Each structure stands twice: as C-alpha cells, then as structure tokens.
C-alpha cells in the first residue's frame, strides 16, 4: 500500500469462515517499521508501533476521535538494538483519504453539485471539529497531512473522519511546546488546503476550529 523511510504498509485479507464467523473476509492493515543504518533505534526506547498504538488509544479515549481498531502490535530486537516492529489494524470500510474525498472547488452548479457542495462543507467542518478537539486535549499529531485523515461514508450523508498514522504524535503539557505543535499541525493541513479549498472555505474552517464568529487580526495571518 505504501512505503516510507522506515515503514511499509500492506493490506491483508483474512478468512473468517475458519473461525466459525460469517463468510465475509476481514480486511486488515499491517504496518512494519524497520530500524536499519542511520535509522537504527536503541532497544530501551519505545518502538514506533507501540507509540502509534498508544496514540490511537489517546485519540479515541481522551479526544473522542475515530481511529482504526488495533488488533496487535509488537517489536523485535537484537542485542541492544531494535530491528523491527509492527502494528496490525482493521481497515476502515469504504474510507478514502481526505485529499481524494475533497477535490478542488468546481464552478458547476448542477443538482448533484449542490449536494456535493453541502457534503463537502460538512466534511470540512467535521475536520475542523476533529482537530479542535484533539488540540484542546493537548495532543499534537505532528504529521497531520490530508492523507492521514480518512473519510468513511456514514448514515444520512454524514461521513465519519478517522485519523491515522500517529507514531510521531504526543500529549504536550508545556504550553510553549503545545502551541508549537498546534501550529505545525495547522501548517501541515494548510499545505493541501491552499490547493483544494477557496479562501472563504479556509476562513470558515479556521473560524470553526477556533470556535469564533469573526477572526481577529492575529488569526488572519494563518490564511494569507
């Protein structure tokens, strides 16, 4: 599915029939971290897979956000060095990355486009609420790209937003570090927002995130 500098993700399909369950297969994601060369890691340090599993629990339990269900995680070491780690999660059915779900604005106003525009605004508002709740709890993701927000169809045209890939995130208690992490998350999101959202959409998104009706002058520099 994907490969990074130290990780590789694979999509797996498991047969439930052998366990006496329904015949519908279970789709899983396996993410493997490898620590080699300049990326090698002391065995006494937490493994990235362990950190990611812990952060999913924090995001779910402390922030009230949707995350993939973690089935297992583990690590392997040789001597004083970690060699690899893994995390196994359930696939979010029918989910698409936010950068695929929200295309660039269109000027066509067909009946379907009006519906899609309403759905688009709902998804963007939900994303603002998600990031606001996460930051209010003191958690910063650090790698908050659009591709790490997955949109899954819900009931009555109310999609659900899932947050992924949080191996670098953490709870920050010190106010200065928390503010730095918050701005880093917002900056990461805005890299794609500049290309996919209009200026008015970005202003509405920021108002929703901040919980204000009007932006103060110091807020407007974030949407220049």
Placement of each model-derived feature along the sequence:
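Short helix/strand-bridging catalytic loops that position acidic/His residues to coordinate divalent metals
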Residues: 39-45, 112-115, 167-178
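Soluble, non-transmembrane catalytic domains of enzymes that act on hydrophobic metabolites at membranes
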Residues: 75-78, 112, 118, 135-136, ...
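C-lobe/activation-segment region of protein kinase-like
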Residues: 158-224
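Alpha-helix N-cap and loop-to-helix initiation/capping positions
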Residues: 44-47, 118-119, 130, 181
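Conserved ATP-binding subdomain of kinase catalytic cores across diverse folds
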Residues: 1-108, 132-137, 141
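Hydrophobic residue at the +6 position relative to the catalytic HRD Asp in the kinase catalytic loop
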Residues: 144-154
């Amino acid at each position: 599915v994907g490969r990074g500098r130290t990780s590789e993700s694979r999509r797996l399909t498991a047969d439930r029939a052998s366990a006496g369950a329904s015949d519908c297969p279970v789709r899983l994601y396996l993410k493997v971290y490898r620590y080699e060369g300049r990326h090698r890691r002391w065995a006494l340090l937490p493994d990235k897979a362990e950190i990611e599993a812990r952060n999913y629990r924090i995001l779910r339990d402390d922030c009230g956000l949707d995350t993939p269900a973690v089935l297992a995680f583990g690590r392997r070491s040789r001597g004083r060095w970690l060699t690899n780690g893994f995390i196994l999660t359930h696939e979010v059915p029918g989910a698409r990355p936010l950068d695929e779900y929200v295309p660039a604005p269109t000027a066509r106003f067909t009946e379907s486009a009006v519906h899609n525009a309403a759905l688009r605004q709902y998804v963007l508002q939900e994303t603002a609420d998600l990031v606001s709740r996460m930051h209010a709890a003191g958690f910063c993701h650090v790698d908050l790209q659009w591709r790490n927000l997955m949109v899954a169809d819900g009931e009555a045209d109310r999609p659900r937003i899932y947050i992924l890939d949080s191996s670098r995130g953490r709870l920050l208690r010190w106010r200065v570090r928390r503010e730095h992490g918050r701005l880093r998350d917002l900056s990461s999101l805005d890299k794609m927002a500049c290309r996919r959202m209009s200026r008015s959409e970005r202003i509405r998104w920021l108002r929703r995130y901040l919980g204000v009706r009007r932006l103060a002058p110091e807020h407007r520099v974030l949407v220049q």
